Amino acid sequence: MRLNKIIILILLSSIALSQSKNALNGFLDFNYISRISDGSIINLPYRLFSLRIDHENEDILIKSNLAIEHKIREETHFLSNESPSDFNLDLRELYLQLFTSWGELKIGKIIHTWGNVDENSPIDIVSPYDYYFTFDSGTDKKMGIFSSAVDIYANNYKLGFTFSPIHNTHRTPLEKDDFPIKLPTYPYENEFMKINGTPIEYGFYGSKTLNKGDISVHYFNGYDRLFNLSGVNVYANGPDKSFSIIDIIYSYRKTKMLGVGTNLFIGNATFRGDAAFFNTSDVNDEDKFLERKSSYLPTIYDSLHYSYPLKEEVNYFQTTLQFEIELPFDIQFTGQYFTYDTLDYKSDSLPLDEDISIPNLEITVDELNPENIFTPGYGSSIGILTKKSAILSLQKSILDDQLNFKLSSLLDIDNKNYDNSIPGIILSLETSYR
């Protein structure tokens, strides 16, 4: 402990005595969103204020990103809460970056970025996503994690490594929120199977620069960002099975990812691509299910009569391809194609009777085939929304690039439940001035 204090004191003294410079930037945003049908407010959290502060001192850089998130209070807020606050302070990033002759080192709360395509890369999985901001771009829709990262440079090669001792999960909308995308279930904390030991996450990558672009290989190992259905236990009071309850059990699968990516520059056109293969498995076996107590009134429902762990083992892949080209009148076109599919699925079955009610699951027992409700716990942020999508974008800048216009569309080309020739689509028009 004394040695750590001495090292910190030396580091702070060197920062104070040497020349340093600071950089600040941010935004203040007021917006309003409502339904076209009836004009009612769509009450979702949004970032009211954001401030980035960078403190640079020779070979040391301290980066921070502070945001204020606002959400309108419900009219019944003060019936159960005395706090007048309607905002949350979010320290999105705070880390130390050290530059050396061989590369750089980062440690702290970091938003990591992997992959080659601009958005929706299946390789970009180190930092979890904030699904309240899923339609934002770049790091705005991602969350920082307490971690460390090392990048090593050697000629045309780059090697990187990242490590976190914490299991990091996506931020998903709550059941009562106005967010248009809903999860199939909203489990309680006591319905989860705990992860044994330290949930270490780590990954590494290597890239090589070529004459016309670059290629890269990525590997990551960690627990899923989204929860999964792990199995079912049936409890009763002693030997009497006339009043039994079904305990739905959730967990986080263990997943390994192997990905490849490339950037190719041909004339005024650019091709980018990322592809990832995922191997995931539920590590909870029969013994863990047998040791588990009921999540509902365990003193009454104290006897386990049936146990059905799923023991899922799944292989799946995701691919994102991107094409960019400059059109006449200095208009920049970007097209992106995303696809995802399950290659191999194995699990045990759930032998449930038709008269058994499954709370919180918006599907019938007949549809409760584990393969049908499988959701990828890693990959692109739109992987839980659709298996195939296309994104088209036109961007134009004027006034020396101070005024920017961007027209974008997201097409759900996997949606087969539409009557017209146009699939599900989201259109957006953005403008910015700086």
Predicted regions mapped to residue ranges:
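Outer-membrane beta-barrel translocator domains and adjoining extracellular loop/strand segments
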Residues: 36-44, 74-80, 87, 118-124, ...
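Transmembrane beta-strands of outer-membrane beta-barrel pores
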Residues: 30-36, 57-59, 68-72, 100-102, ...
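Outer membrane beta-barrel
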Residues: 54-178, 211
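Residues that define the transmembrane beta-barrel architecture of outer-membrane proteins
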Residues: 41-49, 87-92, 99, 142-146, ...
